[in-house]
Amino acid sequence: MIQRNSTFIIDELKSNNYTIDTVYDIGANKGEWTKEWKRNLPQANFYLFEANPSIKLKGNFFNSVLSDEDDKDVKFYLPNMSNSYPTGASYYKEASVYYSQDRYIDVKTKKLDTLINDNSLPLPDFIKLDTQGSEPDILKGATEALKECKVITCEMPIMPYNENAPDFSECIKILKDNEFIPSGCDKIDAKTKGIFNQIDIVFVKRNILEKIHNFSSFYKGY
């Protein structure tokens, strides 16, 4: 079990008087992550974002294909009809047997910043991002949202898992450019056919991590 995961890090921030009032679950699927975190953060307001049009949830839910541009036409790939695979839908087609039938719908994208402005949403303190390869694109379209954010947990590819999707280094660079530093890990996905293909990394805003740990007195890499 990974000790320094998002639960540990959120507790660390709370013990240092940082508040987590607004949480964005981007790539919410059926809302399981939010259900779990509502137990950890009962006072917080959760906002769920899911691109798959077949999924409808109650509450603060937005069915939108987030990206780095508004009104960009993209193909949104869906799993094969012959299986009940619950996740993986994306405008970057998953490179697996579950997506061999090339099923897709035509959709238009929206920047997270635009959606926030259009709906007068509060800016997030904590973001979970799991969107099957489009995470870097969404971050590029969220420059205003990231200004107030304290923690991001983001799924990142180790091996190419979605066709033509940005790679690990690009995601790290975008987050670094927005003053986020890797601080922990939620999950290592190495269970499918012996391949280590994905990792969920927890990032913390640089100034917060510096205030709590004074990391720059030791580590000069960031």
Place the predicted regions along the sequence by residue.
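Phosphate/nucleotide-binding beta-alpha loop and adjacent structural elements of enzyme active sites
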Residues: 1-222
